[in-house]
Amino acid sequence: MTQPLDDAASAIFGPRLELAQRYADWLATAGVERGLLGPREVDRLWERHVLNSAVIGELLDQGERVVDIGSGAGLPGLPLAIARPDLQVVLLEPMLRRVEFLQEVVTDLGLAVEVVRGRAEERSVRERLGGSDAAVSRAVAALDKLTKWSMPLLKREGRMLAIKGERAPDEVREHRRVMESLGAADVRVVPCGANYLQPPATVVVARRGDTRGPNRRVSPRRTGGAPA
């Protein structure tokens, strides 16, 4: 059984800490066995993965609909759903073996979480999940691609929240112009969980502003970037 960082985990998950523990055990066992998590990550599972994901709940309002793009083993979506049961969390993942893992975990933990197999750039996914309040991601792709995938899923003024590493400011500088051309506004780097984690999680936040950018991308013949 994996051991949580007691004070931080208790503060973040409260009475749902047992659910977080069960999810961490899923990651440490089936997650490793199925190749969704490297075995070397087990010893730092809580601070690097579970808590690092859950703390971005600081940036989400009550009852918001949140799409986790490229959810993989459920990060950051499942820790968010456990810590914030008020959120409407959708896990979006294209690979069948990962979708099956996510469905098993959601069922076992009794979470009100939707698992969708697909890619963010697919028209059917955009039609199904468009108008969401937030699109979250973790270790999925560079910011230009994340913006292409995230903006069409968001309502006007919705937010993209991308968990990144210490190079986040450099990546923002590199991709800001492309991001803004795709409809992203107020792009900034925000630390999350400073009261619980050292270092805190680093999150790139961008608001969906000009709706013309994302809408142009629905048709691959138009300028503005067809889905990658």
Swiss-Prot record:
Subcellular locations according to the entry: Cytoplasm
Residues that hold S-adenosyl-L-methionine according to the record: G70, L75, A120, E121, R138
Enzyme Commission no: 2.1.1.-
Cellular component aspect of the GO annotation: cytosol
GO molecular function terms noted in the UniProt entry: rRNA (guanine-N7-)-methyltransferase activity
Major localization listed first in the record, in broad terms: cytoplasm
Uppermost EC category: transferase
Keywords: Cytoplasm, Methyltransferase, rRNA processing, S-adenosyl-L-methionine, Transferase
The keyword Cytoplasm is annotated on this UniProt entry: yes
Pfam families attached to this UniProt entry: GidB (PF02527)
The keyword Transferase is annotated on this UniProt entry: yes
Domain of life according to the entry: Bacteria
Location of region: Disordered: 207-228
Classification via InterPro entries: rRNA_ssu_MeTfrase_G, SAM-dependent_MTases_sf
Record-stated family: Belongs to the methyltransferase superfamily. RNA methyltransferase RsmG family.
Annotated function: Specifically methylates the N7 position of guanine in position 518 of 16S rRNA.
UniProt name for this protein: Ribosomal RNA small subunit methyltransferase G
Source organism per UniProt: Mycobacterium marinum (strain ATCC BAA-535 / M)
Underlying gene: rsmG
